[in-house]
Regions:
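Short coil/turn connectors at secondary-structure junctions
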Residues: 56, 73-74, 105-108, 144-146, ...
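DPxDG-like acidic metal-binding loop motif
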Residues: 71-130
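Short secondary-structure boundary/capping segments
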Residues: 27-28, 52, 67-70, 112, ...
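N-terminal subdomain of lithium-sensitive/metallo-dependent phosphomonoesterases centered on the IMPase/IPPase/PAP
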Residues: 1-82, 256
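Acidic active-site catalytic centers that drive phospho-/nucleotidyl reactions
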Residues: 40, 63, 80-83, 87, ...
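An extended, acidic
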Residues: 137-257
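Residue-level signal for inorganic ion chemistry
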Residues: 18, 40, 51, 85, ...
C-alpha cells in the first residue's frame, strides 16, 4: 500500500504548478467547452513520474492520457491534474488536484488539494477524512430548508444535458437556502465532506473527477452515489450526488431521478 505522507508530499509539490499559472495561457481545445493547458500537462507528467518511481507496480490513469488499458481489479492511481481547468484559464481561483488510489472498484486513498487556499483534504479507507490534519464530518442538516448545495452543469454535453440539469438545479434551488457553482467537482465533494456545503450533484463526471471525493465523503460520514442511488464503482462516466445520508436520500428520491 502506498504511504500516505509520501503521496501528500507529491500532491503538495505539484500544487506549485497551479500557483505559477503563466503556462495556462497555452491552451489546447479537446472538445466542446473542454480544454487542457500546459499546467495540466506539467502536473500530470510530474505526478506520473514521481508515483511511477516510488510505486512502479501500480497502474496509472490520468485525465490527459486516458486512452490506456487499465485493469481496475488491480491497484491504479486515478489523477485529475487540474480539476477546474476553465477556472484556471480565467484565473478564477477554484481549481484543485485530485488523486485517488483504487482497487476492485473501490477507492482506498483519496487526496484533494486546493493550492490557492493551501487546503489539503485526504482520506484513507476505514480511517476517516481530514483537512490539514483536522478530522472532518459531513453536515448534520436534515431538511432542504437548512441546506446550501453545490452543483455542476456537465458543460461538455450542453446539448444533451443542459436543459435537464437546470431543471433539476431549479427544483433544488427553490427548496433550499441557496446553491453554488464552483467549477471543480473535487473541491465541491471535499467541501461536502467538511460540512461547508450540504450536498453536491452533477449529471456527468469522469472517474478522475469523483474517485478521491467519494472516499472523502464516505469517510466523513456521508454517501456518494449516482443519481439513481447506485454505487459508483469504477464507471468511467457517471452522474454523482453526495451529502450526509439524510440529504443524499432526499436528493435521490425527490430531485434527481
Amino acid at each position: 500500500m502506498a504511504e500516505l505522507e509520501q503521496i501528500k508530499d507529491i500532491v503538495l509539490k505539484a500544487g506549485t504548478f497551479l500557483k505559477n499559472r503563466e503556462a495556462a495561457g497555452h491552451i489546447t481545445v479537446k472538445g466542446a467547452s473542454d480544454y487542457v493547458t500546459e499546467v495540466d500537462k506539467k502536473v500530470q507528467d510530474f505526478m506520473q513520474k514521481e508515483l511511477g518511481e516510488k510505486y512502479p507496480e501500480i497502474q496509472f490513469l490520468g485525465e490527459e492520457k486516458s486512452n490506456e488499458e487499465i485493469d481496475f481489479s488491480g491497484l491504479v492511481w486515478v489523477l485529475d491534474p487540474v480539476d477546474g481547468t476553465t477556472n484556471l484559464i480565467h484565473d478564477y481561483r477554484r481549481s484543485s488536484i485530485s488523486l485517488a488510489l483504487m482497487e476492485n472498484g473501490q477507492t482506498l486513498l483519496g487526496v484533494v488539494y486546493q493550492p490557492y487556499t493551501d487546503e489539503l483534504f485526504w482520506a484513507k479507507k476505514g480511517e476517516g477524512a481530514y483537512l490539514n490534519g483536522r478530522r472532518i464530518h459531513v453536515s448534520k442538516a436534515e431538511t432542504m430548508e437548512e441546506c446550501m448545495f453545490a452543483f455542476g452543469t456537465a458543460p461538455y454535453d450542453k446539448e444533451k444535458f443542459g436543459e435537464e440539469s437546470f431543471r433539476k438545479i431549479y427544483r433544488v434551488f427553490m427548496d433550499s437556502q441557496d446553491i453554488r457553482r464552483s467549477g471543480s467537482a473535487a473541491i465541491d465533494m471535499a467541501e461536502t465532506a467538511a460540512g461547508r456545503i450540504d450536498g453536491f450533484f452533477e449529471r456527468k463526471l469522469s472517474i478522475w473527477d469523483y474517485a478521491a471525493g467519494r472516499l472523502l465523503v464516505s469517510e466523513a460520514g456521508g454517501r456518494a452515489t449516482d443519481f439513481e442511488g447506485g454505487e459508483l464503482g469504477c464507471a468511467m462516466k457517471s452522474s454523482v450526488v453526495c451529502g450526509n445520508p439524510a440529504i443524499h436520500a432526499l436528493l435521490v428520491r425527490k430531485y434527481l431521478k
